A protein has these predicted regions:
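Alpha-helical solenoid repeat scaffolds of the TPR/TPR-like class and their adjacent stem/linker regions
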Residues: 1-382
Length: 382
């Protein structure tokens, strides 16, 4: 019951349920672990660590518990501990590590070798960590990237990939080592001092960028500044309630002078445009966007013609960052680990600005800060 309430966002009720369960059964491992996760989600890190420690005393080898502790350490910027604990994710029931006859790469010399790099988790994770292919290629490796089929087109423009294989295709047999893209960061002992933050590492075809310059000028009225907006991420993500926000939250953006708001939202969430009451219209792009050229291809080209992108924590945020486009990410009270804590920037993407929620569930004030920030950035130089 506590977990069900957590997924519904009924935080205090969930905590009470866990407390009741522990009162009845003081050695209830799942209650300790899930109570810790509840507090981790809501930013009460000290409480989360307390309940995780209680759970650890009962089951010191629990994989999910170690994974969760890894996430907290990464969020806090303690990458040395974080990567080690996060390795336990492969032992969790919701993760499956591919099995190959070739050895896993754990730091062996790659000069003249071929390494298979495979995606794990979501599209945003792949866009985020595919940067490491270039580093391994520079180290002498031939890199094969096995990625989600929907990313195959856009990753054709990614530096450092020798060969790209969609995950709907059979993996080639001829490689020397394998490693997940995310585990490369672990093997390389990436921390805050050596994050490879050079962008862009994904590039759009120049002809497609030129095409969309012409198209936007035909489809949209003239505008001094164009801002692309995204508000809804994957509704099936377990943390979606803390990441996505209603479109109406973005009304403060209408107070920015001489801006045009362009929706980059497709599928779930786009229906909210019908009930938009902001003082500036939201312009929508053609429904067949990305259909002929491949997922993200048209979108990426369009990003080159926007002054700023304002987005929730979605795969598009990673795409914009990888393209080195000026981007503001609106983050929930406790963000995903890669955004760290208490800073307005990210070492992963130098063209990105982070604005963080200060109260769970309140997005209007975040959007107001975005509007103030963009007003400063877009005002004429004096």
């Amino acid at each position: 019951m506590g977990n069900s309430l957590r997924y519904l966002g009924r935080i205090e009720e969930a905590d009470q349920r866990f407390a009741q369960a522990l009162k009845l059964k003081p050695d209830y491992f799942n209650a300790y672990r899930n109570r810790g996760t509840l507090h981790a989600w809501t930013g009460r890190i000290d409480l989360a660590l307390k309940y995780y420690a209680d759970a650890m005393r009962l089951h010191p080898q629990d994989a999910e518990l170690h994974r969760n502790l890894g996430v907290i350490s990464l969020l806090q910027g303690n990458f040395d501990i974080g990567w080690k604990e996060y390795r336990y994710r492969w032992q969790c029931t919701d993760a499956s590590q591919p099995r190959y006859s070739q050895p896993k790469w754990t730091g062996q010399d790659l000069q003249g070798k071929t390494i298979l790099l495979y995606a794990e988790q979501g599209l945003g994770d792949t866009l985020h960590f595919v940067r490491f292919a270039k580093i391994l290629q520079i180290a002498g490796a031939r890199t094969i990237v096995h990625c989600q089929a929907s990313l195959a087109a856009i990753l054709q423009g990614c530096e450092g990939i020798s060969s790209l294989v969609p995950n709907t295709w059979k993996v080639p047999d001829h490689f020397d080592y394998h490693c997940s893209l995310m585990d490369v960061a672990d093997v390389m002992q990436i921390d805050l001092s050596n994050i490879p933050g050079e962008t862009p590492y994904i590039k759009s075809p120049p002809n497609l960028v030129a095409y969309w310059k012409r198209q936007l000028n035909q489809l949209l009225p003239p505008a001094k500044h164009r801002i692309g907006i995204v508000w809804q991420g994957n509704p099936n993500h377990q943390a979606d309630m803390f990441r996505s926000f209603p479109l109406e939250s973005l009304e403060p953006l209408c107070n920015i002078d001489d801006v045009q708001l362009i929706s980059l939202q497709f599928g779930k969430g786009s229906e909210q445009i019908k009930s938009w009451k902001g003082s500036k219209p939201i312009y929508q792009l053609p429904d067949d966007l990305d259909q002929s050229s491949g997922a993200f291809m048209d979108t990426a080209a369009i990003l080159h013609h926007l002054d700023w992108i304002v987005t929730s924590d979605t795969s598009l945020a990673h795409l914009a960052g990888a393209l080195a486009r000026p981007t503001v990410v609106m983050l929930g009270f406790t963000p995903d680990w890669r955004w760290l804590l208490d800073r307005p920037d990210t070492p992963w993407y130098p063209t990105m600005h982070l604005i963080r929620q200060t109260t769970i569930g309140q997005w209007h004030s975040v959007a107001q800060q975005v509007a103030d920030f963009l007003t400063t950035k877009l005002q004429p130089a004096t």
